[in-house]
Amino acid sequence: MKKAKRIPALALSALMATSLLVGCGGAPASSSVTTDDTDAVSTASSTAQQENTPVDISIAIWGADEGLSDPNDPILKGIEEATGVHLVPQNVTWDDSEQKIQLWATNGQLPDIFAGDFVAKSFYGNWIEQGVIRALPDDLSAYPNLAEHMKMERAQAAGRDGKLYMIPRTTYGDITYSVLDRNVVYRWDLAQKAGITKEPETYEEFCDMIKAIIAADPDGKSISGMTQALPELIGGFVYPSAGIIDKKWVANEDGQFVPSYFADRDDLVDAMQFARDMYTDGVIEKDIALAKLETSKEKYLQGQSAAMVFAWSGPAGLEAQIGKDYDALYGEGSFLRDNRIAKLYPAKDGNKYYFVDTEAWSESYISSKVDDEKMAAICRLFDFLYSDEGQRLVYCGIEGEDYDVVNGKVVMKDGVDLKEKYTFKKNNNVGDLAMWNPEFWDSDYPSTISPEYRELNAVRHEDAVKNGTLPTYYDGVLFLSTPLKDAFVYNTNDDLLQIMMGSEPVEKMVDDMLASYEAKGLSEMLAEANAKAADLGIKVK
């Protein structure tokens, strides 16, 4: 995007957040938040603990039914015994979670706790206004670890009228690590068989490589182009090609705050044309809109897709998601030998942009139907999960069995694979309710991921810091609540798929789309949001 001001990624990386709790490495800082809230919740907490009766807490997070299926799982038992809760799954998957949660919010069937990427969407404000979700207690002094966590800028920025309605799930140390949230893995072995001798350095070279693989079809499997591991990932490859950071608000050339998506019409045309060309040429698979996790993984594993867009907190996540299965099929060490991660490629202006979202992707929410007793139990749960003891249990396992403490540091035992050993950790995210495992970005954090895979994450992040361009963005505006802003809905993924797969000229479709948004009140919404930003003293940097 040509109009937004930019700051070097290297400078931002130096500002890595120091408030992340150290989990397996040491003790977290504690502090109190003192306000004028009543003590009903803390009283309920004391009463429940005195009675020693576990409080049933229903929870919806990806794969919860599997993660909570063994009541005797040592990690799960440790959490429940330490907090006085009994976790009950209300299952969602990566394919259906948002639809299910929005439906439950409408029909009153929300679980006590649910997770998702909702804070920047219009219905977050609606949930607050309609009383769908409950705010955390004003006084969190009884829960010092939770209180410390809620000082996070993202949590405070998303508050309403002094109330905190969501708990950020910490992902990374700073925003530059969000490059790990959109990655492309491709079959370098097949590219070489197709006559490619150099790994691609540009978008054009990448597309030429995929087309060469498809044309040669070296393994005779009628291989197709690039798929995505989950719905809505493909934009993370497309939009940076035009400098668009579609999750953020920026300042346009007129000094007006706008979603990056709407900041420059020509940039949007460029991005959509790039997507259309890839789709037409077969670089992007024809059934990309139907992509589902297990299907996409299997197609890539079987050599039926030449490339795949994925998240998984970076390439290190490939080991558990597909690398081990690949090695089982094709021989030990074959995945790292046969596959490569796409580098950052330059846009038309020469800058190498990348997907930018947040250092805390997704949030945990509490249903308004939760009473004081349950709220106290939920606060105890999160307070424990943010404690040193809780993080060690969730991410390091059982002391003496899975890890030892040597000179004050946790050292994982050789051969330990928590995801294979514990049902609580296998193929689900229930263990990441409070935060994502720091092992994906913090190289000093104890981990059972192979060093070779962790190094892939380090290399990708280094590419972003040294070579990437991070436009200046304004989360203070992103989280503003105004009537028109809360009601205005746009979906960059749906727009992308519609135009990419469309038959009319891209430029016409983009103009028609923008006209449609204008008819829905885009300009009025922007004027209202900018007026509110001015009232709050938010200025263009």
Name what the model sees in each region.
Residues M1-A11:
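Bacterial Sec-dependent N-terminal signal peptides
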